[in-house]
Amino acid sequence: MAYTTKVNGCAAEKADGVLNGDHNKEKKDPYFVETPYGFQLDLDFVKYVDDIQKGNTIKKLNIQKRRKPSVPCPEVRAIPGHQGVWTSTESLSSSNSDDSKQCPSFLLARSHVTSTPIPRPPAPLETSPTFAVSENRQLLPPPSPQLPRHNLHVTKTLMETRRRLEQERVTMQMAPGDFRRPRLASFGGMGSTSSLPSFVGSANHSSAIHQLQNGYQGNGDYNSYVPAAPTTSSMGSSVRHSPLSSGISTPVTNVSPMHLQHIREQMAIALKRLKELEEQVRTIPVLQVKISVLQEEKRQLASQLKSQRASSQNEACGVRKRSYSAGNASQLELLARARRGGGELYIDYEEEEMESVEQSTQRIQEFRQLTADMQALERKIQDSSCEVASELRENGQCPSRECKSVAVGSDENMNDVVVYHRDLRPCKDTAVGTVTETRNVGISVTEAMLGVITEADKEIELQQQTIEALKEKIYRLEVQLKETTHDREMTKLKQELQAAGSRKKVDKATMAQPLVFSKLVEALVPTRDQMVGSHVDTRESCVGTSVQTSSVGTSCHPDCKNQVVGSELPMNWWVVKERVAMHDQCVGRSVETCDRSVGVEVSVCETGSNTEASGSDLTLLKTNLNLKDVRSIGCGDCSVDVIVCFPKECTSRSMNTEAVGQEEAAVMAVPHTTDQHTSTNLERVDQCTNTEAATLVESCTNTLLSTMDKQTSTQTVEMRTVAIGEGRVRDINPSTKTRSVGVGTVLSGNSEFDRPCAVKTKESGVGQINIQDNYLVGLKMRTIACGPPQLTVGLMGSRRSVGVGNEPVGELPEESPQPRVASGMVTGLDHYIERVQRLLAEQQTLLAENYSELAEAFGEPHSQIGSLNSQLISTLSSINSVMKSASTEELRNSDFQKASLGKTTGNHLEYTCKCGGLRSGGLLNVQPSQPEVEAETAEGKHSRGHEQFPMQGSTLPPVNLTDDQIATGLYVCPNNENTLKSIMKKSDGNKDSNGAKKNLQFIGINGGYETTSSDESSSDGSSSSESDDECDTIGYPPEEEEEEEEKDHDTRGMAEGHHAVNIEGFKSARVEDEVQVPECEPEKEEIRERYELSEKMLSACNLLKYNIKDPKALASKDMRICLNTLQHDWFRVSSQKSAVPAMVGDYIAAFEAVSPDVLRYIINMADGNGNTALHYSVSHSNFQIVKLLLDADVCNVDHQNKAGYTPIMLAALAAVEAEKDMQVVEELFSCGDVNAKASQAGQTALMLAVSHGRIDMVKGLLACGADVNIQDDEGSTALMCASEHGHVEIVKLLLAQPGCNGHLEDNDGSTALSIALEAGHKDIAVLLYAHLNFSKAQSPSTPRLGRKTSPGPTHRGSFD
């Protein structure tokens, strides 16, 4: 036993020579580098690897030095005496090199010791708990402080080896070999899960082979060492470079390149293992938590065992107290070392375990009880452990002798220098330590058989399994985290790119917005300041008329204003304070109820005692009780049934006092509400007063004149084109059209509308008799053709005869207008017809001279002029009867300009009409009855929302002109083509927004009737069939309207917001007989179906009114529900294809009555796609609704939807059928920025209109200041778009603009000329070429050279 202990001590001495020897002072050996995970790396090995990298390889050496055999080190861990020595090949320590320094006899003895437990593995498992732990933890090395270190003998050996290698390098001529170090053996187990490295088995074979090759002679135990190789080789690979080839003791004899490759592989494996250990360190906090949980479970299990066995084991616990505690402490230390052997999983588990054992008395008592239960089992375990130890020592006695003998004679340098000198002292020290270790092993073996320890081992295994599972999960989570992080970074980059693009687009879209808003502000401020004193400013700015009227209204009623001003400012604030105090009781409905039945409530109070018997009194008291209930409930919509239950009880109790108090409170609220309504009525009356002074006719006239000037420049450019064109070009229309434009400079822009209409009217051939038999629609259309002479401004004589004389119409007798009209019509029409006949004859003569094919079609001009004369006489006679009994609604609707119709001071109806490009305004004298005047004065225009006028603030005094003045005014310009060509007649009186087909008839040059219609209408449609559909109004179905037309006149034009008088209420059969205006007509004019907001909408509007200034309140849940209700109802009414303009007008009036801010908010409300009601109305071509929205003066015309389009851009693509719709579109263009770019491609409204061939929209945009040279994101201009799509007329129109630049290039370097050539449009290419090269050389008077042939191409183009 003692000898065996010394053998073990030799091993311990070889392993822990530095720790237990005199060199304990040296913290680090110069040939070691300690890694962060407890491993030690040999510096010679590092240098060796560097030499291999540098190419300093070593040739094979023939050294006569005997080599020491290497031993598989991991099996030493099975011996309890070697638990303090770590010799596993999985670490980077120098354990293998230390083993190589041991004596051969001891190595052989160790080989017997290690090979003993292998045939019977159950014995170590039962006897040693340390072995059980180490079997499951062979991948985990011990902590770095307990790792073995080299002594000075290593240094001397390495120096000697280097010297020999340098000598052999010079002398030997063999192939270069590789140099091998024993440290590489430690890399084999880094990535392996087996208990031994992959090359341990081959190491034993190679060591034996090298011994035989080098002439080594072993003792009798050599054979026992060799069988250990196959035992361990089954667990590893066949490649093993044993420590014999390390070069520490002897140089390498035969090292192949395969060995170097293996070294590199093991280095890579080691680095991977280090990386894995670094990842495992991150799981330490999680594992600490899990260990604490397992400890708690262990404590609970132990407490259960304690409660079960506490009765029978008290005395035994007292006997085993100290010994078990000591054993438990050592065992826990060993378990902790085994757990943290890998280095990266080291946690303060050992310290926590020791502290818990020492400090927690409860845990000590648990172990005591478990120890007492297993005393008999401990004795058996100790006996078995003693037997096992004796067997191990017996097996190790013989090799110990051999080891000593071999060690003395094998290595001379080790005996002389270091080994022999230190074998004396360290062996004694190690023997002392071995005794202590033996005791620990005995105690640990005893504890291994306890039930608690077995459960603890199971728990540890479960913990390890959990740790491994957690490692895998953490690895997967890290991979997912990296992928997610990468995806988020990519998403952020995409979002940043999108944000940058959106910012760029937003910058493009909003560049022009500040200018527009600043212009509006400048227009509003001066108009408000100068409204009181001057009407000239009001004429200049039409936008601010509504604001100015309110200020004038205050001046018109100074008494009321003083009262309102004195009471409104403080009363509003007082009302707000009272509402705040009594908000929970009354919101305002009670106030309205008090207003409606103030007197009834007072009477009920006086007769309160009779309320119990009379049923009528009960109904009266309902109002009072409603007040009380409403106040208690608040803003909620309480049902009527709930309220009805209370009046019975209240009346029986005769609550007269409460009723009196409520009535008094209601009386208090009456003046507040009355003041507010009074002020509202006053403002509306003032607006009507200002409407009478409308002088917008003059401003519109100026606009037409400026447009004519622009068209004059267009004609000169076209004349230049003619001069440059070749033979083919001369035959094409552009040359001839330019000459015709030169003749009629003023009306060239409007000739496009007139020519096709004239041709189609001729083909229809509608006769005079048929017109009289049809509905008044046809007659009304003809009144427009012959109507302008009636205007007092000077266009139509027949109109003038209606209002003969300067005296007011109201003073004339009712019978007098009829004969006067008849006489005036005859004189005015004769002169008018003569002039028309002469002009038509001249036109036909010119056409016949220039075009031979037309001469045959015309025939005798004089014969057709005679038929035209009869047609005009019959038409004007029928018109005469209509004009005396109806208003000028249809005249206004057929106008080319916006109609401004209002009341003047002399009870006149003002209107404007344009015919043939000229603009005229006049006053049509109508005789309204006195009740109508009084009703209009009292109620104002606001009470009739459908009769409001779009433009207010200017007035025109009535003027009566003579027939000569009318005739001269009709032909102001001798070169007026439109005037010479045709007189417009409209074949339908459509005033609603149903999008019906509209036909226009013109009296052509050749004397026949020509019909033109929109794209949707057919050329052969009669006026009677059209009028059947168009006579339907918005508010009435067709059946109801026929009954109303037979009885009285209803109001028309509601969708447009104009004052309208019914002219369709008379059937065609009654036109010639009915001349006198009925007296009851103005009174029945007010009959119309009104649309009112629902209670839910009203409550939502009131809630929005009080919270519209508070962004936080708007974001609340209640407000979101409120806004959703408003949005749904508003879009349902205004944004449908079949939307009713009258309903939209009533809604707008109701919103404005609540608050202007509420009106602004609701009209500009957008849906999920960013579209407002204006977007939808323009898209559906509901231009009457567009007119109502624009008249509200709160629309944001430049609002872009998600696609980046504004209402102006959508209007550029809309289909316009009637001229009044075109007027609305022009008004829309004037209200916004026509040069705004879409956010998608940067296109403007002009580019969109040009691309789709909308020449009418192009003209309107150019008139409103659209820039021709703006380029989109691709660099294209409107001229390039027109050249690409082949729109010749649009190209001419664009080139006629003064600043049109044809030299611009797009992003591809293409110009408009190159694009036209690529598309094959040669005529456009010639125009562009002429414009680029000859536009400045041509004189402006050139167009007059071809005047003789000018009418030909113009009218030929119209017929084409």
UniProtKB/Swiss-Prot annotation:
Location of region: KN motif: 30-68
UniProt-listed GO biological process terms: actin cytoskeleton organization; cell population proliferation; cortical microtubule organization; negative regulation of actin filament polymerization; negative regulation of cell migration; negative regulation of insulin receptor signaling pathway; negative regulation of lamellipodium morphogenesis; negative regulation of neuron projection development
Main localisation: cytoplasm
Keyword Oxidoreductase: no
Molecular function in Gene Ontology: beta-catenin binding; protein-macromolecule adaptor activity
Motif (Nuclear export signal 2 (NES 2)): 125-134
Compartments reported by the entry: Cytoplasm, Cell cortex; Cell projection, Ruffle membrane; Cytoplasm; Nucleus
Motif (Nuclear localization signal 1 (NLS 1)): 65-68
Residue ranges of the motif Nuclear localization signal 2 (NLS 2): 985-998
Descriptive protein name: KN motif and ankyrin repeat domains 1
Designated gene of the protein: Kank1
